[in-house]
Amino acid sequence: GGADSLALAFLLKDFQKQNGGRAAVLTVNHHLRPEADAEAAMVASLMKKWGIEHHVLNWFPEEGNGGIEEKAREARYRLMEDWCVKNGFYYLLTAHHQQDQAETFLMRLQRGSGVDGLSAMAEMTPRGKICVVRPLLEAEPAALRRLLRENGIVWAEDASNGCDDFLR
């Protein structure tokens, strides 16, 4: 339901309309925020309107083990990879953009990564039996939000994105 993901889904809708093929949007509900269920329902409604297959994948965090952001990220990718394999999808598109690329570099630098670790996110990365594709790496977040505004699309703003308590 975030701006970046909805912009990718909007572009996917047009791509699918012009080129055919099967596409699906996956929403991972981590059940970490009270508004998560409503946001998943909002995405489901929008995808139905756009004629895009949609599935909600649920992850329920274990209590009190710390490192929740990293665990949620690992669970998100595992859930999406498993779903793709079971449903015959080889490519998993994510909405990482230019700012995410810069944040990843800075986070890795802070953690003391070597030269290889400091390399940027690749546009395509094999992961198990699928390939993660990041088609928006060159896009600026402001441009993605502008695309949504120009098309009257409302997105959900995750308050934790503005929180510096977690490294992502």
Where are these regions (language model features)?
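Core alpha/beta nucleotide-donor-binding catalytic domains of modification enzymes
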Residues: 3-168
